[in-house]
UniProtKB/Swiss-Prot annotation:
<dbReference type="GO" id="GO:0051670">
    <property type="term" value="F:inulinase activity"/>
</dbReference>
<feature type="glycosylation site" description="N-linked (GlcNAc...) asparagine">
    <location>
        <position position="372"/>
    </location>
</feature>
<dbReference type="GO" id="GO:0005576">
    <property type="term" value="C:extracellular region"/>
</dbReference>
<dbReference type="Pfam" id="PF00251">
    <property type="entry name" value="Glyco_hydro_32N"/>
</dbReference>
<feature type="binding site">
    <location>
        <position position="67"/>
    </location>
    <ligand>
        <name>substrate</name>
    </ligand>
</feature>
<dbReference type="InterPro" id="IPR001362">
    <property type="entry name" value="Glyco_hydro_32"/>
</dbReference>
<feature type="glycosylation site" description="N-linked (GlcNAc...) asparagine">
    <location>
        <position position="210"/>
    </location>
</feature>
<keyword id="KW-0964">Secreted</keyword>
<keyword id="KW-0326">Glycosidase</keyword>
<comment type="similarity">
    <text>Belongs to the glycosyl hydrolase 32 family.</text>
</comment>
<dbReference type="InterPro" id="IPR013320">
    <property type="entry name" value="ConA-like_dom_sf"/>
</dbReference>
<feature type="binding site">
    <location>
        <position position="233"/>
    </location>
    <ligand>
        <name>substrate</name>
    </ligand>
</feature>
<keyword id="KW-0624">Polysaccharide degradation</keyword>
<dbReference type="GO" id="GO:0000272">
    <property type="term" value="P:polysaccharide catabolic process"/>
</dbReference>
<keyword id="KW-0732">Signal</keyword>
<feature type="active site">
    <location>
        <position position="43"/>
    </location>
</feature>
<dbReference type="Pfam" id="PF08244">
    <property type="entry name" value="Glyco_hydro_32C"/>
</dbReference>
Amino acid sequence: MLNPKVAYMVWMTCLGLMLPSQAQSNDYRPSYHFTPDQYWMNEPNGLIKIGSTWHLFFQHNPTANVWGNICWGHATSTDLMHWAHKPTAIADENGVEAFTGTAYYDPNNTSGLGDSANPPYLAWFTGYTTSSQTQDQRLAFSVDNGATWTKFQGNPIISTSQEAPHDITGGLESRDPKVFFHRQSGNWIMVLAHGGQDKLSFWTSADTINWTWQSDLKSTSINGLSSDITGWEVPDMFELPVEGTEETTWVVMMTPAEGSPAGGNGVLAITGSFDGKSFTADPVDASTMWLDNGRDFDGALSWVNVPASDGRRIIAAVMNSYGSNPPTTTWKGMLSFPRTLSLKKVGTQQHFVQQPITELDTISTSLQTLANQTITPGQTLLSSIRGTALDVRVAFYPDAGSVLSLAVRKGASEQTVINYTQSDATLSVDRTESGDISYDPAAGGVHTAKLEEDGTGLVSIRVLVDTCSVEVFGGQGEAVISDLIFPSDSSDGLALEVTGGNAVLQSVDVRSVSLE
């Protein structure tokens, strides 16, 4: 859960800035990214698949377009793209709001909250008491396949007094429980974030209700982690195969409030070992640990209970790092497009790699393709294409010293430019002229990521464009940049150009995306 004090300050300072600076026919609402039906959303919660249904819970204010009255919103899908809005899953009540958490299936009914014929699904969340601003950990359960959720009568399951020996903030900074069953030890594991102390704590339970502290993972115990990376939040933890080997490794994913490549919050992942009580981190590489180099990928979590026959680790995050500031009036916050996360060796380094889920192909139609064509300085390709919901894929061999530029959401005076600069192997997103950037000091600028040519000299770039966002995937997905943009409706053009040398286009595929 993002820091409530910061969110409250943003709310209070921005109430007078809610009107957009330019008229928009759809209030910038995306075409194929999830947004709440109305009002405020931040990070996803409790991502779980139950049967054939994907469940998305999320931090939500159901009464206003600002942070506050936080509960778990709920939506379901059978394909991770078409979402049905559902009633509030876990409400704020009696002065206690429902902050971030996770869900898991209890097939053996170890919690005793279901029965052997109908085991429960469980959701752990942070209870935020508004009067004291303190946080404790709570439990809810479902015995109807996630349709409705009941709060456990014995809440909290970890009180502020139980947290006290491990929390120097007096209950102000202990939140976002990640819970899973650890097969090797036969225990349930809870990972808590302590943003004010830059640490995670690990707890165990035999029954999902009674918890015992086991260890802390502190920033000082992670070799190579910068001291500038502070305010740890929203942990996730899972085993991930190392592609091309028979090995798996434990991964901890979290969202620091400060220290990301684009400034402010961002999502990082580290590998290590876990013995059922403590996590030992591998030395980190600052060049590979960040999952996204853009400004708008925050509070990522992964879906659990995904069948082995599927085998994917699918993650999503909220795209909004500006509080109430973005120029939308009926909604705030959108979900990143779901992406797979894997771990593989790229060149000489081990990388986390991400790609949009393949289901996207089922809702996209090719508009134009090119193959084996050389583009030279002064040429502009793709300029006949118009669209605000696109999937653009470009694979090319750049000349030494060349810069390949793909402009999206291009208009008379607006464009968002994705560049690949061959001389320093840099992928970038330039929002300087992307549209409305007046709403926040961090809304413009250029975000960069390192992207090396492959062994043959090929560079691959994939760009998901929607009404108010770009998500750029470079190479095999080892370089990712996600950013919000707010152009005018009329800025719907596309342009592919090169400067400083030629580029041989191995393939180009521009696809229109539509949920209809």
